[in-house]
Protein backbone atom coordinates (compact mmCIF):
# COMPACT_ATOMS: atom_id res chain seq x y z
CA UNK A 1 0.00 0.00 0.00
CA UNK A 2 1.05 3.53 -0.76
CA UNK A 3 -0.32 7.00 -0.16
CA UNK A 4 -0.68 9.56 -2.94
CA UNK A 5 -1.40 13.22 -2.31
CA UNK A 6 -2.75 15.27 -5.19
CA UNK A 7 -2.91 18.97 -4.37
CA UNK A 8 -3.49 22.37 -5.90
CA UNK A 9 -2.30 25.70 -4.51
CA UNK A 10 -5.25 28.09 -4.15
CA UNK A 11 -4.54 31.70 -5.23
CA UNK A 12 -1.06 30.74 -6.44
CA UNK A 13 -1.04 33.58 -8.97
CA UNK A 14 -1.38 36.14 -6.18
CA UNK A 15 1.94 35.14 -4.60
CA UNK A 16 5.32 34.82 -6.27
CA UNK A 17 6.22 31.17 -6.96
CA UNK A 18 9.65 31.96 -5.48
CA UNK A 19 7.93 32.28 -2.10
CA UNK A 20 5.50 29.37 -2.00
CA UNK A 21 7.49 26.91 -4.11
CA UNK A 22 10.67 27.34 -2.07
CA UNK A 23 8.67 26.96 1.14
CA UNK A 24 7.07 23.81 -0.24
CA UNK A 25 10.43 22.35 -1.30
CA UNK A 26 12.01 23.12 2.08
CA UNK A 27 9.05 21.66 3.96
CA UNK A 28 9.09 18.40 2.03
CA UNK A 29 12.87 18.12 2.31
CA UNK A 30 12.76 18.76 6.08
CA UNK A 31 10.00 16.14 6.40
CA UNK A 32 12.30 13.60 4.78
CA UNK A 33 10.38 13.30 1.50
CA UNK A 34 12.78 12.40 -1.29
CA UNK A 35 12.60 14.73 -4.29
CA UNK A 36 11.99 11.74 -6.58
CA UNK A 37 8.75 11.08 -4.65
CA UNK A 38 7.05 14.38 -5.49
CA UNK A 39 6.48 16.66 -8.42
CA UNK A 40 5.04 20.08 -9.20
CA UNK A 41 3.13 20.06 -12.46
CA UNK A 42 0.81 22.45 -14.35
CA UNK A 43 2.45 25.32 -12.48
CA UNK A 44 0.71 25.00 -9.13
CA UNK A 45 -0.35 21.37 -8.76
CA UNK A 46 1.56 18.91 -6.62
CA UNK A 47 1.59 15.15 -6.49
CA UNK A 48 3.58 13.06 -4.05
CA UNK A 49 3.96 9.44 -3.05
CA UNK A 50 4.41 8.47 0.59
CA UNK A 51 3.75 5.68 3.02
CA UNK A 52 0.07 5.58 4.03
CA UNK A 53 1.00 6.18 7.66
CA UNK A 54 2.65 9.49 6.67
CA UNK A 55 0.00 10.72 4.22
CA UNK A 56 -2.30 12.54 6.65
CA UNK A 57 0.66 14.01 8.54
CA UNK A 58 2.16 15.38 5.30
CA UNK A 59 -1.24 16.69 4.22
CA UNK A 60 -1.69 18.60 7.48
CA UNK A 61 1.91 19.83 7.30
CA UNK A 62 1.44 21.13 3.75
CA UNK A 63 -1.80 22.82 4.80
CA UNK A 64 -0.19 24.49 7.84
CA UNK A 65 2.83 25.71 5.88
CA UNK A 66 0.73 27.03 2.99
CA UNK A 67 -1.61 28.91 5.34
CA UNK A 68 1.39 30.84 6.73
CA UNK A 69 1.43 32.85 3.50
CA UNK A 70 -1.37 35.43 3.32
CA UNK A 71 -4.05 34.72 0.68
CA UNK A 72 -2.66 31.24 -0.03
CA UNK A 73 -4.32 27.91 0.66
CA UNK A 74 -4.09 24.35 -0.59
CA UNK A 75 -6.72 21.81 -1.50
CA UNK A 76 -5.73 18.20 -1.56
CA UNK A 77 -6.85 14.63 -1.80
CA UNK A 78 -5.13 11.67 -0.23
CA UNK A 79 -5.50 8.33 -1.95
CA UNK A 80 -4.46 5.04 -0.38
CA UNK A 81 -3.91 1.91 -2.45
CA UNK A 82 -1.40 0.06 -4.56
CA UNK A 83 0.88 1.59 -7.17
CA UNK A 84 0.90 -0.75 -10.14
CA UNK A 85 3.09 1.37 -12.43
CA UNK A 86 5.92 3.53 -11.15
CA UNK A 87 7.48 6.01 -13.56
CA UNK A 88 10.43 8.36 -13.12
CA UNK A 89 7.84 11.15 -13.06
CA UNK A 90 5.36 10.89 -10.20
CA UNK A 91 2.57 12.29 -12.39
CA UNK A 92 3.10 9.47 -14.91
CA UNK A 93 2.76 6.70 -12.33
CA UNK A 94 -0.50 4.79 -11.91
CA UNK A 95 -2.51 2.41 -9.80
CA UNK A 96 -5.38 2.43 -7.29
CA UNK A 97 -3.59 4.90 -4.99
CA UNK A 98 -3.44 7.45 -7.83
CA UNK A 99 -6.99 6.68 -8.94
CA UNK A 100 -8.31 7.09 -5.38
CA UNK A 101 -6.45 10.37 -5.01
CA UNK A 102 -7.77 11.64 -8.36
CA UNK A 103 -11.37 10.63 -7.65
CA UNK A 104 -11.25 12.32 -4.24
CA UNK A 105 -9.64 15.43 -5.73
CA UNK A 106 -12.28 15.73 -8.45
CA UNK A 107 -15.01 15.50 -5.79
CA UNK A 108 -13.58 18.21 -3.51
CA UNK A 109 -15.81 21.07 -4.73
CA UNK A 110 -15.59 23.65 -1.92
CA UNK A 111 -13.77 21.33 0.49
CA UNK A 112 -10.01 21.47 0.83
CA UNK A 113 -9.25 17.94 2.04
CA UNK A 114 -10.58 14.50 1.17
CA UNK A 115 -9.33 10.97 1.70
CA UNK A 116 -10.19 7.89 -0.36
CA UNK A 117 -9.04 4.41 0.56
CA UNK A 118 -10.07 0.87 -0.38
CA UNK A 119 -12.22 0.87 2.80
CA UNK A 120 -15.53 2.73 2.37
CA UNK A 121 -16.37 2.71 6.10
CA UNK A 122 -13.00 4.28 6.88
CA UNK A 123 -13.56 6.97 4.22
CA UNK A 124 -16.97 7.87 5.66
CA UNK A 125 -15.49 8.42 9.12
CA UNK A 126 -12.63 10.60 7.85
CA UNK A 127 -14.54 12.68 5.29
CA UNK A 128 -16.85 14.58 7.59
Predicted regions span which residues?
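Regulatory and interdomain segments flanking nucleotide-handling catalytic cores
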Residues: 1-128
